[in-house]
């Protein structure tokens, strides 16, 4: 099975690092996609986990710029999924839910924060998922 995991924060690395190893040990192809954030790349490099950076430079600023970055990530993830015949997506970003829905794929969506803390993320994810873990 081809599994895509998107990480957008160092906390996501700690949430997924063991699952990534377990999937690989079980013979699955695991593709890790990231956007540049704090020490995320260093954590992956130190763990020896191969990754693809789909947004090396973010435009953080206005809400419009944040929305634009999300659309860019959606597009890049969608292209990646088609190129690598992804079967299932997992992560804690709206893009995972949105792309899975658009491509008719399954997704496992997680959050590491309370919905009141990341309300905008939940609102962007909720229409596309059955459940958020």
Question: What annotation goes with each model-predicted range?
Answer:
Residues 2, 86-88:
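Structural motif
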Residues 105-133:
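Active-site-proximal region of nucleotide-activated glycan assembly enzymes
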Residues 10-24:
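Short amphipathic alpha-helix
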Residues 63-85:
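An amphipathic, basic-hydrophobic alpha-helix
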Residues 1-10:
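Nucleotide-activated donor-dependent transferases that construct or modify glycoconjugates
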Residues 38, 89-103:
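An aromatic- and histidine-rich active-site surface loop
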């Amino acid at each position: 099975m081809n599994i895509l995991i998107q990480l957008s924060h160092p906390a996501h690395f700690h949430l997924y690092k063991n699952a990534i190893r377990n999937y690989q040990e079980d013979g699955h192809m695991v593709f890790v996609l990231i956007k540049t954030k704090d020490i995320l790349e260093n954590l992956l490099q130190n763990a020896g986990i191969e990754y693809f950076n789909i947004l090396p430079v973010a435009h953080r600023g206005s809400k419009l710029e944040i929305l634009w970055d999300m659309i860019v990530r959606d597009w890049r993830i969608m292209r990646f999924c088609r190129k690598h015949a992804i079967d299932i997506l997992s992560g804690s970003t709206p893009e995972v839910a949105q792309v899975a829905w658009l491509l008719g794929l399954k997704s496992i969506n997680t959050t590491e924060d309370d919905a009141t803390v990341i309300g905008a993320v939940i609102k962007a994810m909720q229409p596309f998922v059955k459940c958020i873990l």
